[in-house]
Amino acid sequence: MKNGKFVMDAHTGFWDASAENCKNKYGEAFVETFYAFHTGFNPGGQAQWTMDYEKTFRKVDPDWYLETMFVQGDADMAILSTQVLMDFYHTGFTNPERNAEMIKRAPDRLIGLGGIDPRAPDALEQVDRQVELGMKGFKWYTAEWRGESRGWKANDPMVFPLYERCIELGIKNMHFHKGPAVEPLALERFDVRDIDEPSTLYPELNFIVDHCGLPRLDDFCWLSARSPNVYASLAVALAFVHNRPRFFANVMANLLFWLGPDRIIYGTDFPIWYPQWQLDDLMAFQLPADIEDEFGVSLTDETKEKIIGGNIARLYDIDTAAKLAQLKGDALDVRRDERVASTPSQTAGAGAR
């Protein structure tokens, strides 16, 4: 809870990129790119936000995840994403089974996403199995390698039966990585324009575009303007808030202009970066006056409340007041209250509620 408001991080990962799990040089390159993002975007001059690559970053410890997200951080809930990448990792970078085990540790706070490769011959059966595991949505990773194939498109007819199966099962939230390329994957495979067709064909589904299409923000905004079931997740974009505030301001102004305040979703991409400095900086952030004037938008406290939790809660049918009441007094909440009481307010990453 931040300033008395519900917080839900819509983009986090529980990954294993340990040397033991890496199949080849591509698995090493993938996690090394993540770590380059980590060091490159961290708040300048604040060493407390830098993780040790071998001890902390490569393989996420479940206790550390919960402590960082819900005790040292102000999130009330979080979504565990999935990027399987079986060509790079023996058991996958992340996977639904690992998510399901993690959720058992904090079932009232965590939501898991499944991950399907539509090129797999048993893709439909995987949808069923992962929903049975408890996954509440799906993460689609269009640049994933599979043998000689170097990716697929969200508008390929082979994917349509999977969308339809999700609808039949009552799964409505489709999360897509449409943003920066991660070595060795190709940027063109994350082109956001392939969302256009399925988002219009399947109005029953919500298309949550992680990283809001960056660097193709214009394409994302134009297609989203006509598709009310397309949403922008701020993961990665939000990481610019501290060191590149004007860049972030332009991203936010475009999203507010084209999509409005009800379709922008908070996500930190933790553990690429610690979540708390991103949340603190977002809550303190104001659009520069010239950008407000140009776009005719404002980043108000009411809008921030929607972004940090209200919008994603609505998509997952979560009553935020009831959820906060449910979480009040659980073990993580008690420890967070103790942390808040003992921590003086600071700048980035203060964690003050």
Regions of interest found by a model, annotated:
Residues 11, 69, 78, 112, ...:
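Divalent metal-coordination and catalytic microenvironments
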Residues 18-20, 90-92, 125, 186-187, ...:
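A short acidic (Asp/Glu
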Residues 11-13, 83, 115-119, 141-145, ...:
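Active-site beta-loop-alpha junctions enriched in small/polar residues
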Residues 23, 136-137, 151-266, 273, ...:
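Catalytic pocket-lining loop regions of alpha/beta-barrel enzymes
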Residues 70-71, 131, 167, 257:
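Non-catalytic positions within long, well-ordered alpha-helices that form the structural scaffold/packing
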Residues 56-66, 92-100, 159, 191-193, ...:
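Well-ordered, non-membrane alpha-helical segments in soluble/globular domains
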Residues 76-189:
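Active-site gating/metal-coordination segments in enzymes
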Residues 1-68, 77, 128, 258-263, ...:
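Mid-to-C-terminal alpha-helical segments outside catalytic/metal-binding sites
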